[in-house]
Amino acid sequence: MRRLNLFPLAGILFSVLVLNVAAVDAAAQSGDFEIAQHGQAVGSASFQFAATKDGYDSTSLVKVAMQELDYALSKNEELGAANQLKHVMLSATVNGEAVSVVAAPDSAQFLLNISANGKSSTTRLAPHPGAVFLPDFDAGALETLLALAVTQNNRDLWAILPKGAGSIEPVQLATYPDQEGTLDGKAVTVHHLVATIAGANTELFSGPENQLLQAELPQEGFALVRKGFVLSPAAKPIAPTGDSGAVPAAPAN
């Protein structure tokens, strides 16, 4: 059973509050999202989690099609029973450029093997049990962060960012008053948080089971919205911080 609470190729993406939540069957856990910029649909994102004997397998898909950005991503992860990252394989294209990343813990390090621009490199990062692998527009990564927040009691959370040579950054979460919304036409209470990663803020809205419903991303005007969800009133943009560039960047080698 996977317990959910509460969040970049470019680095999108906690005074904390531990929420009491019901256990959710990971085998049935999935989500479909619209990617929008200034309210206009520009792509889609989806994820699915399946229970295994040792934890969970997760799959994420992302597609963005804009005049200045053609972005596609496929990510497969193996997670432990407490949502620890065991292995990840990512394949992506950014404006026609192919990128692949394979990552896994290795002894006292976490290794990122990156292939981009026709070159390969390996980056060694400090390992953290509360780390999540966070590519751009990846709703599944945000869902995993919500689960990790419960596992870690909202403490010692980290984001592995597959940007440049790759890095790992602390995650801070601030809680705000609950809001209201509808999911598939039914009224729901919406939990509201702001995650800060590498100096950039992302607003997170989660449902009664703390499943991801919406994320307002640091890139100007971009949002992930679960299909069938409507926030009332609509989210107001938070003050921009950090790198708010709109286009994901392939790792530089």
Locate the predicted segments by residue.
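N-terminal compositionally biased or targeting/leader segments
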Residues: 10, 141-143
